[in-house]
Amino acid sequence: MADEQTVDTQNPEANQAPEASGDDLATRVQVLEEQLAAAQDQSLRVAADLQNVRRRAEQDVEKAHKFALEKFAGDLLPIVDSLERGLELSSPDDESIRPMREGIELTLKMFHDTLTRYQLVAVSPQEGEPFNAVEHQAMAMQESADLEPNSILKVFQKGYQLNGRLLRPAMVVVSKAPAPVSPSIDEKA
C-alpha cells in the first residue's frame, strides 16, 4: 500500500518546507527590527504632533478668553470719555449741579474700577512726554519753542490697552520745531 501522508489542516505552517536557513532568519529579524524602529519613530512623531495641536488649541482658547471683551470694551470707551468730558466741562463750584457732578464722579469711578478688573488700562500721556507711535496717534502738529520736537503738547483723548494689547491709541497734538524766522525786507537793507 502506498504511504499515506497526513496533512495537518489546523496548522498550515507545519505543511511548509523545512525551516529557512540561519542567514534568512537573520535577514528577516533585521527587516522586522527596522520596521519596528520605523513604527516607533512614527508613533513618537504622531504623539508630538498631537501634543502640539493640543497646545495650540489651548493657546487659542486662552487668547479667545483674554480678548473676548475687546469689542465690548471698545464700545464702552466712548461712554467713559463722555462722562470724563462732562466732569471737565462742569464747574465744581456750581452748587446747582453738585449732586449731578457727584453722581457722574461715582459712575465714572465704578467704570474705572470695572475696566481695571478686566485688565483694561488707560494710556494717558502727559504733556512733554515723547511721542510714541505705538501708543499715540498724532492728530495735529504744532510749533513749540518750549518743548522738544516730537513731544506731546496736548491730549485730545486717552487711549486704552486690553491685556497689554492696544485697544485704542491716545489722540494727541505733537510739537515740532519752530520755523526759522526769515529776515524781513527792512532787515535786509
Curated annotation (Swiss-Prot):
CDD domains recorded: GrpE (cd00446)
Location of the region described as Disordered in the Swiss-Prot/TrEMBL record: 1-24
Predominant cellular place of this UniProt entry's protein: cytoplasm
Record keywords, A-Z: Chaperone, Cytoplasm, Stress response
An annotated Gene Ontology molecular function: unfolded protein binding
Gene Ontology cellular-component annotations: cytosol
GO biological process, one term: protein folding
Domain of life: Bacteria
One Pfam family in the UniProt entry: GrpE
Family: Belongs to the GrpE family.
Biological role stated in the UniProt entry: Participates actively in the response to hyperosmotic and heat shock by preventing the aggregation of stress-denatured proteins, in association with DnaK and GrpE. It is the nucleotide exchange factor for DnaK and may function as a thermosensor. Unfolded proteins bind initially to DnaJ; upon interaction with the DnaJ-bound protein, DnaK hydrolyzes its bound ATP, resulting in the formation of a stable complex. GrpE releases ADP from DnaK; ATP binding to DnaK triggers the release of the substrate protein, thus completing the reaction cycle.
Name of this chain's protein: Protein GrpE
Organism: Pseudomonas fluorescens (strain Pf0-1)
